From Swiss-Prot:
This is Large ribosomal subunit protein uL15. Residues 21-31 have a biased composition (Gly residues). It comes from Buchnera aphidicola subsp. Baizongia pistaciae (strain Bp). Part of the 50S ribosomal subunit. Disulfide bonds: none annotated.
Length: 147
């Protein structure tokens, strides 16, 4: 195989159909747009959800609820991600420094991923699931909570 012998597969570059070029082309006169109507005119852009003047579905359905702008995001960290660290104090700053969570996160919960770890961890001021609490305390680690 040489560079000068390379060529695209046949029919891989389909030529666009030229419209408005006579009756024999099959796309002459109206250019495949049919006769009259809004869609046959130039510059036809009908917005999404437009139902021809009928009250659209998204306005017929009642509104409910809202999205709170004050909501604090709680990031989840799997216990399996912490198995590389041993005898470490794991807190919010440590997780940000190691890149396990983003810098704008304020709350973290450590969840179980099914695997059992054997290294000793000290978890400080983080939310922890019940199964993770059991795993860490059985492996000799500690969970220190806010006072």
């Amino acid at each position: 195989m040489y560079l000068n012998t390379l060529s695209p597969n046949s029919k891989s570059h389909k030529k666009s159909k030229r419209v408005g070029r006579g009756i024999g082309s099959g796309f002459g006169k109206t250019s495949g747009r049919g006769h009259k109507g809004q869609k046959s005119r130039s510059g036809c852009k009908i917005r999404r959800g437009f139902e021809g003047g009928q009250m659209p579905l998204y306005r017929r359905i009642p509104k409910f609820g809202f999205v709170s702008l004050k909501k604090e995001k709680v990031a989840e960290v799997r216990l399996e991600d912490l198995k590389n660290f041993s005898n470490c104090i794991i807190n919010l700053q440590f997780l940000k420094k190691t890149g396990l969570i983003k810098k704008n996160i304020k709350y973290v919960k450590i969840i179980s991923s099914g695997s059992i770890i054997t290294n000793i961890l000290i978890i400080r001021n983080l939310f922890v699931s019940k199964s993770v609490r059991n795993i860490i305390e059985s492996s000799g680690g500690k969970i220190e909570e806010n006072n």
